Each structure stands twice: as C-alpha cells, then as structure tokens.
C-alpha cells in the first residue's frame, strides 16, 4: 500500500515506540497510518475499537488492503466466537465502544495490538467503556483521533495511561491543570480554569509516541475525495412505503397523494432516521473544526439541533440568520436550509 510522505514520516517517528497516537486532522488518512502501524507491530491477534457507524468501513478497509489477515466483525456473536479460538493465522477483530465492554471474553486476550479509532471516546475515566479499555493488557496500543482533547487537556489523562505514561491523576493535574475551588451557595467543587507547562506536556506526549498534524502543515495533500456515508433503511420507512401511513412520535404521516408520500418518505430517510442521525453525530464528533450541515425540513432542523446540542450552533433559514457561533467559535455547527443558503453566504471559515 502506497502512503504519502507525511504518513511515512509518522510511521518513522513511532518506529521505536511500543505505543503510538496519531492526532491528525480529518482527511489526513489516520485510517491508513493506523492500519500500517498495526501491521508493523506484527502481532497475530489485533482488535480495532471504533464508533458503531465505522465498523463496516474498517472491515472493508482491512479486507481490501490486508488480504493476509482474517477479519472478524465482533458485533456478530459467531464472529466473536471464531475470533477467540482462531488458530495460527493473523486476525483482526473489529468492535464498537458501546459493545466492547460487554464482551468479557476480550479480557482473555494476550500478546495483541489494540487500536482505538476516535480515542477521544474514552476521555471520561469513569465511563464503563474507558474502564474496560484501561483494564486490557495489549502489547501495543494505537490511538487515532482528530480531536484528542478538543482543547481540554484534562480529558487526555486516560489516553496517556494507554500510551504507557504511569503518572497519577493527582500528579498530572498538579503539573499541567489549573483548578480552583468554587461554591455557589451549595457544596464546594473544583473547576478547571486553565493549563500550565503545556510545552512540557506536548514534549511528553511525543516521548510516549504521539504525533500531531494539522492539514495546513502537510505540504503535499492528496486530492480531495468525497466520502459517502450510507445509512440503513429503517423498518418505519418500509412500512410507510407499503401502507402509506405510519405514526411516529405521536405524529401521523399519511401519504394520501403522490406528493405527500414522497415528502414523508424523504422525512423518514432524514429527521426520523435514527441510524442517519447516529452517523451524523459520529461524523461531527470526529472533528473539532467548523461543520456546515444543509437540511430541508423543520423536522430535520429540530432533530439536528438536538443531535449537536453540545456544540455552538448557528442557523440560517427563511426566518433566522444567526451566524454568531460560526463567526466566533471554530468548533461550531452551522445548520443551513438549502434554499436560504443557496446564495449570498461566505462560509470559507469552514475550510
């Protein structure tokens, strides 16, 4: 597999590291860098933990580019059983974060490489999935993320432990995190107010195998490619197309004409599609850059606002033109109704 120069450089920088982390902007090929590092570690048994919407992509990636490995979808119980007893040959098991900690069999693995795609998913140390990942004993760990901390270094601690840095949380906070005690008439609690010794922290990250790259730092970028995300057809959509009527969230959709049937069918494929919304959330969470989302219907707008409620939101439609979040927050999400955004908008900040 032919890699770009900056990808080869990333592998060279981690060639002497037992663990590695590739904190690269979206579009710089973390998938290829991570899978090559996995191959170079040379373990017979390997697991990849990713977001649910990415399982199929990872399976296809390894099947296409690493034909000497047996690939198992560990969300499938039969594949899981086969993976745990697979003899002799090299194998890769792929599973999502939400299911991994329920697969107790994985604790039995020894002498294996573990790769975490979007490793920012384990930033919460008290979450079951984070505790489970920290309990495993891989020979090598690979972390991939475009947003390892989203600018908040207190969320980096669990990833540092996976990279092999044996620093206590107390020592980490005392050295790198500024905090203070506050009380608003109730119990006293500690809040993060800033950071210190950041240059030293970044140097430590590199020492333990972390490599960083922003898109603008890579001189020879590959030609841009459009990547399609496919969502599954829901049972609600199938039922509506058959019966022309369905009730969702106390709302009855009736396709009593060709036009209304087509209109509601489109809604069922967007605002009412749980799989599509889930994939969108995963996509937004994979970057800390500005994101632009175009939509058609008000029902879509409400679903989108709920889905990305943890990010600063701007909205442009026939009734509202609010671009404050877009202008002032580099991690904002801008929701634009197709017709309202057809002309007259400069959105170049969203690279």
Region locations from a protein language model:
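Conserved Walker A/P-loop ATP-binding site and its immediately adjacent core
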Residues: 33, 43-64, 150-155, 296-299
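Conserved helix-turn-beta segment of the N-terminal RecA-like "Helicase ATP-binding" lobe
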Residues: 54-77, 163-167
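Conserved helix/coil segment N-terminal to the catalytic DExD/H
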Residues: 79-113
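Conserved helicase/translocase motor-coupling segment
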Residues: 216-309
């Amino acid at each position: 597999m032919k890699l770009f120069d900056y990808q080869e450089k990333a592998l060279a920088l981690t060639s002497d590291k037992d663990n590695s982390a590739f904190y690269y902007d979206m579009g710089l090929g973390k998938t290829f860098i991570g899978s090559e590092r996995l191959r170079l570690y040379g373990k017979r048994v390997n697991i990849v933990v990713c977001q649910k919407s990415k399982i199929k992509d990872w399976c296809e990636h390894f099947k296409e580019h690493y034909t000497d490995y047996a690939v198992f979808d560990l969300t499938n119980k039969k594949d899981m059983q086969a993976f745990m007893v697979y003899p002799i040959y090299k194998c890769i098991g792929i599973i999502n974060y939400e299911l991994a900690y329920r697969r107790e069999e994985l604790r039995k693995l020894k002498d294996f490489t573990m790769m975490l795609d979007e490793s920012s998913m384990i930033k919460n140390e008290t979450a079951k999935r984070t505790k489970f990942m920290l309990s495993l004993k891989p020979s090598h760990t690979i972390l991939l993320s475009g947003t390892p901390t989203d600018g908040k270094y207190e969320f980096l601690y669990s990833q540092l432990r996976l990279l092999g840095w044996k620093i206590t949380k107390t020592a980490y906070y005392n050295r790198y995190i500024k905090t203070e005690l506050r009380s608003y008439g109730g119990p006293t609690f500690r809040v993060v107010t800033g950071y210190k010794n950041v240059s030293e922290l970044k140097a430590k990250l590199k020492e333990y195998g972390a490599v960083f790259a922003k898109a603008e730092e890579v001189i020879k970028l590959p030609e841009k490619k459009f990547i399609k995300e496919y969502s599954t057809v829901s049972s609600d959509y199938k039922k509506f197309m058959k019966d022309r009527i369905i009730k969702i969230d106390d709302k009855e959709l009736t396709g009593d004409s060709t036009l209304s049937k087509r209109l509601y069918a489109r809604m069922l494929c967007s605002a009412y599609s749980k799989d599509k919304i889930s994939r969108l959330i995963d996509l937004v969470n994979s970057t800390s850059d500005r994101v632009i989302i175009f939509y058609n219907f008000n029902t879509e707008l409400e679903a989108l606002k709920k889905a990305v409620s943890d990010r600063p939101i701007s909205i442009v439609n026939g009734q509202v033109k609010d671009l404050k979040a877009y202008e002032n927050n580099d991690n904002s999400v801008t929701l634009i109704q197709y017709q309202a955004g057809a002309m007259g908008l400069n959105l170049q900040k969203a690279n």
